């Protein structure tokens, strides 16, 4: 099993290219099933979850080809959905990735039937699929859950437009319903919809393929269904979580970094907290520069919340920052009930953290000490790498398969910025 070894003490300096967004490319790849011709998706990150989604699409019968790009947009994937004949998504592929549930809406909407195994993914708390099921039922779907599978069908040919109000904000629930509504008969209204940039990116992709959607990025989305989407091309937006992770890493190490072709407007909450921590930040239309040279960060308080609030996917990274910051920082997690699993590993490095329910109180220390640690989920693994970058000695991070689900070549990118980091098998 692979491990990552980090030797701390070197400030990160230089330029980095941010990959396409993991949380956007997965629903967009699912949405290609709605088209009646090939769809080319560019700026695709090379991640374990992307490979899993490709394998799922191929299992359904779709033709999938990956093309390596030589320009800034990177690699592209072309999906030809015209060969889809299978409507069952098996457990052996689904078990490693929760986003596989995003195939439910497109399969049901286009083929009138879908059978998707209940999903897996990071073990960071309960993320039920009941919102997906109820949303699709509002469009006329008949759904049961039997033997670990969601079994859905449409008895009257096509899904019918309807109105659905989410009990709680659900990103993947909004995406599933949005895709299904795009080819349903009539008008659908989605209330209390997720407003995340990745939802907007999916909507813009659907529109590029012929969908009629208004209100994406607001709590109310209106979809006028069309019979089928067309083929086309679309470029995935840059990954805001990877962007934030590299910014925090640079701030922690007292470095300087420049990023081009990013979306600063999707990172207001993160950039605000980094400024509060003492970083000097310059923002352009599609660029971010951060300078923390010669300074120790100040602790920050934060509470996770749905977009445009502070993203839960950046909570672990800011906890790592607070571990070596000056002062005491309080972090409240409101999205998932089990997302402090990285705390025990940070304690092994010498961090001072006290947990009180859904709140972590972090007393900053001047330095951490390298030690063997174990990744427990995707973002926790990133926080351990960040902590290793500022720890004395070597930090060895085990179970990094979590990391490969969401970060493309993170050791190569950090190494290019000056970090002493390597993968060990």
From Swiss-Prot:
Main location: cytoplasm
GO biological process per UniProt: cell division; cell wall organization; peptidoglycan biosynthetic process; regulation of cell shape; UDP-N-acetylgalactosamine biosynthetic process
Entry-linked Pfam families: EPSP_synthase
Keyword field: Cell cycle, Cell division, Cell shape, Cell wall biogenesis/degradation, Cytoplasm, Peptidoglycan synthesis, Pyruvate, Transferase
EC code: 2.5.1.7
Ligand binding (phosphoenolpyruvate): 22-23
Molecular function terms, GO-annotated: UDP-N-acetylglucosamine 1-carboxyvinyltransferase activity
Catalysed reactions listed for this entry: phosphoenolpyruvate + UDP-N-acetyl-alpha-D-glucosamine = UDP-N-acetyl-3-O-(1-carboxyvinyl)-alpha-D-glucosamine + phosphate
Pathway(s) it belongs to: Cell wall biogenesis; peptidoglycan biosynthesis
GO cellular component: cytoplasm
Role: Cell wall formation. Adds enolpyruvyl to UDP-N-acetylglucosamine.
Annotated positions binding UDP-N-acetyl-alpha-D-glucosamine: 98, 127-131, 313, 335
EC category name: transferase
Catalytic residues in the record: 122 (proton donor)
Location relative to the cell: Cytoplasm
Native species: Xylella fastidiosa (strain 9a5c)
Tree of life domain: Bacteria
PTM-bearing positions, type 2-(S-cysteinyl)pyruvic acid O-phosphothioketal: 122
PANTHER family, per the entry: UDP-N-ACETYLGLUCOSAMINE 1-CARBOXYVINYLTRANSFERASE (PTHR43783:SF1)
Transmembrane segments annotated in the record for this chain: none
Keyword Translocase: no
Source taxonomy: Bacteria, Pseudomonadati, Pseudomonadota, Gammaproteobacteria, Lysobacterales
Protein name as it appears in the record: UDP-N-acetylglucosamine 1-carboxyvinyltransferase
Entries under InterPro entries matching the protein: Enolpyruvate_Tfrase_dom, Enolpyruvate_Tfrase_sf, MurA_subfamily, RNA3'P_cycl/enolpyr_Trfase_a/b, UDP_GlcNAc_COvinyl_MurA
Family: Belongs to the EPSP synthase family. MurA subfamily.
């Amino acid at each position: 099993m692979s491990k990552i070894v980090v030797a701390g003490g070197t400030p990160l300096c230089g330029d980095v290219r941010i990959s396409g967004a993991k949380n956007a490319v997965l629903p967009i790849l699912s949405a290609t099933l709605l088209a009646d011709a090939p769809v080319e998706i560019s700026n695709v990150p090379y991640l374990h979850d992307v490979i899993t989604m490709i394998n799922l699409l191929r299992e359904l019968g779709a033709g999938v080809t990956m093309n390596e790009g030589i320009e800034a947009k990177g690699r592209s994937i072309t999906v030809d959905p015209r060969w889809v004949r299978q409507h069952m998504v098996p457990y052996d592929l689904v078990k490693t990735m929760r986003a596989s549930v995003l195939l439910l809406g497109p399969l049901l909407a286009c083929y009138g039937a879908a059978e998707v195994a209940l999903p897996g993914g990071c073990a960071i708390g309960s993320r039920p699929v009941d919102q997906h099921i109820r949303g699709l039922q509002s469009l006329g779907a008949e759904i049961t859950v039997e033997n670990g599978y969601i079994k859905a069908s449409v008895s009257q040919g096509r899904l019918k437009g309807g109105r659905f109000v989410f009990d709680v904000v659900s990103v993947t629930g909004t995406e599933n319903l949005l895709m299904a509504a795009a080819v349903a008969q009539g008008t659908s209204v989605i209330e209390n919809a997720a407003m995340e940039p990745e939802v907007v990116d999916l909507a813009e992709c659907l529109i590029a393929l012929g969908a009629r959607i208004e209100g994406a990025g607001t709590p109310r989305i209106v979809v006028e269904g069309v019979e089928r989407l067309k083929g086309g091309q679309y470029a995935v937006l840059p990954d805001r979580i990877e962007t934030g992770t590299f910014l925090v890493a640079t701030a922690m190490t007292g470095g300087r970094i420049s990023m081009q072709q990013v979306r600063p407007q999707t990172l207001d909450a993160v950039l605000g907290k980094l400024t509060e921590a003492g970083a000097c930040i310059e923002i352009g239309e599609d660029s971010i520069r951060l300078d923390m040279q010669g300074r120790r960060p100040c602790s920050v308080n934060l509470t996770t919340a749905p977009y445009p609030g502070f993203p839960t996917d950046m909570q672990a990274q800011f906890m790592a920052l607070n571990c070596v910051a000056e002062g005491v920082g309080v972090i409240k997690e409101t999205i998932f009930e089990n997302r402090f699993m990285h705390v025990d590993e940070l304690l092994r490095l010498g961090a001072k953290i006290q947990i009180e329910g859904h709140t972590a109180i972090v007393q900053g220390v001047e330095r951490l000490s390298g030690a063997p640690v174990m990744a427990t989920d995707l973002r926790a693994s990133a926080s351990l790498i960040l902590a290793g970058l500022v720890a004395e000695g070597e930090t060895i991070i085990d179970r990094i398969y979590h990391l490969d689900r969401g970060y493309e070549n993170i050791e190569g990118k950090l190494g290019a910025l000056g970090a002493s980091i390597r993968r060990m098998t």
